[in-house]
Amino acid sequence: MKLQLMICLVLLPCFFCEPDEICRARMTNKEFTYKSNVCNNCGDQVAACEAECFRNDVYTACHEAQKG
């Protein structure tokens, strides 16, 4: 779990709640990178793009670390 949390903190700003328009733009683009894949666990604001973000292993590890 500590390793997952470290990966999360180093590669993905989990605390950053992106605006809806950015989320929608990334959903349209369908091309995710470490820098742009900043979906988070902030609630309904990003619910629409969380399914896409889960395709990224780093985000998945981050999400699991947040839950744990």
Swiss-Prot record:
Its main location: secreted. Belongs to the helical arthropod-neuropeptide-derived (HAND) family. Expressed by the venom gland. It comes from the Eukaryota. The keyword Secreted applies. Residues 1-17 form the signal peptide. It is found in: Secreted. Arose via modification of ancestral neuropeptide hormones (ion transport peptide/crustacean hyperglycemic hormones (ITP/CHH)). Keywords: Amidation, Disulfide bond, Secreted, Signal, Toxin. Comprises exclusively 4 tightly packed alpha helices (no beta strand is present). Toxin that paralyzes insects. May have a direct effect on the insect central nervous system. One of its GO terms (molecular function) is toxin activity. This is U1-agatoxin-Ta1b. One of its GO terms (cellular component) is extracellular region. Disulfide bonds join C23-C53, C39-C49, C42-C62.
